[in-house]
Amino acid sequence: MSDNSHNLLYNKFELPESVKMSPVEGAAGGIDKVARFVADPLEKGMGHTLGSALRRALLIGLEAPAIVSFSMTGVLHEYMAVEGIIEDVTNIVLNLKGSLLKKYPLQDCEGGRASQKLRATISIDASDLAAAGGQKAITLGDLLQEGTFEAVNPEHVIFTVTRPMQLDVMLRVAFGRGYTPSERIVLEEREMNEIVLDAAFSPVVLVNYFVEDTRVGQDTDFDRLILQVETDGRVAPKEAVAFATQILSKHFSVFEKMDEKRIVFEEAISVEKENKDDILHKLVLGINEIELSVRSTNCLSNANIETIGELVIMPEPRLLQFRNFGKKSLCEIKNKLKEMKLELGMDLSQFGVGLDNVKEKMKWYAEKIRSSKNTKG
């Protein structure tokens, strides 16, 4: 347990209150397969930092189930044909690779992370063939007769039967990440004539991110991160982003343990959470009405900053541009504002105040407050 005396005070970081998710117009599959996520405001540079990290984690880190092997009555190896089935085994293998299954390996879920064998018996008689016009398509949904997996594309055709027959089919399903070629897949208790498949485990099809400029109050030097995620349906985009975030947090925690010193961040002050009248009474105060050193007061006076409102709307970097305004004066002013539950770079737009009109607005509000006091008196 670290001592609080080792904590380091850091200036606040602008963070989004939430991440906004929206559908992508014209995208097939709707929001369950394609979604756009917008996070703003972020500190300059954080848009690319987070976007790149999330993109890599989404593409390489997420797990999903996939069919890794199968066996079927009459099938001895991959390079053969089966009498009464249109597709040869090579094409059946390709169709199985296009099968999409979903199920999460929760700790309390039957089977957990171990591979599972799903067995099905397909019985096709003459009446089935007649009803299907002589060719009966066997779909992924037909093969999922047991187990706890759900087909994302149940109508996906695996093979087509042209004569009455009965087939026993076994599908082995496992969990993994990324893409694993068949020669790297290890099967426990492999059955005779069980054919191993290449497995595409990753449920994420495409990830793009963009970074735009955005503003906080009058300061435009912030990032907006736009992340667009497309999945194959085994995992929804919203889940994918949440899982990728947890994966990154897990890895970053290893580096966090290197030092016991903890960072304590100053919190951003939300005008919405404060009483507006109280805020206004503070904003109209003159700089000479608060206890600042002569040096800091003179620096503000030389910059033509006369009221607290004119001060707090000013971004920190802009203050440092004023002549003779140094880090010592900045630190003193920030501490004084913190005592007043104010800060630099505040958004005063709800009061109709911006950098271009702050001086006039402060005079107007000061007069309004004086008139209100006189009326009450």
Curated annotation (Swiss-Prot):
Its EC number is 2.7.7.6. GO terms for cellular component: cytoplasm; DNA-directed RNA polymerase complex. CDD domains: RNAP_alpha_NTD. GO terms for molecular function: DNA binding; DNA-directed RNA polymerase activity; protein dimerization activity. It comes from the Bacteria. It catalyses: RNA(n) + a ribonucleoside 5'-triphosphate = RNA(n+1) + diphosphate. Residues 276-377 are annotated as: Alpha C-terminal domain (alpha-CTD). Keywords: DNA-directed RNA polymerase, Nucleotidyltransferase, Transcription, Transferase. Residues 1-259 are annotated as: Alpha N-terminal domain (alpha-NTD). GO terms for biological process: DNA-templated transcription. The keyword Transcription regulation does not apply. Homodimer. The RNAP catalytic core consists of 2 alpha, 1 beta, 1 beta' and 1 omega subunit. When a sigma factor is associated with the core the holoenzyme is formed, which can initiate transcription. The N-terminal domain is essential for RNAP assembly and basal transcription, whereas the C-terminal domain is involved in interaction with transcriptional regulators and with upstream promoter elements. DNA-dependent RNA polymerase catalyzes the transcription of DNA into RNA using the four ribonucleoside triphosphates as substrates. Belongs to the RNA polymerase alpha chain family. This is DNA-directed RNA polymerase subunit alpha. It comes from Chlamydia muridarum (strain MoPn / Nigg). The gene is rpoA.
